[in-house]
């Protein structure tokens, strides 16, 4: 084995101001016999800075944060870039709300796709008996087709409910919907995999998951 893995980070967490910087690298020939490596040939750098105000009333704390990251391969080609601005509110009763705006670049089949996305979400966990939450994301997304990749529009919604009526029993329900459309008419029937309807919809997927466990 001749490959290598490098990971370095610095973090500072204060009462109001927090920041972090990190970098890691996975060489193209990195292998391991004791685990699975999702991706090699990667150099990544990222950073985060956030600030919090603490009214400590019905609004416990709130504040903005900024995240930025870049991924290069070992040929110095930029493959991914992401910048995110987020605003987070934490309320009494273990309730959280966030809004975020993303600017991203994703490289696929030698093409750089520039994306703009928006998201809003939150959760309520004011009781040990349950937790409910969800999010909504929308914006540009890549249609990953080897023959004709293009930039379309995606909306995704997720709602979940966790129930814990007794200490030994837990139940979780997830409802997910993802809808992808081609507003610019770039889908080519016969060349692209899949179909597109008269409204430009390429797919609309609904997934419902339920899992219950009881510990004896």
Task: Indicate where each model-derived feature is located.
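Exposed, low-structure sequence patches enriched in small/polar residues
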Residues: 2-216
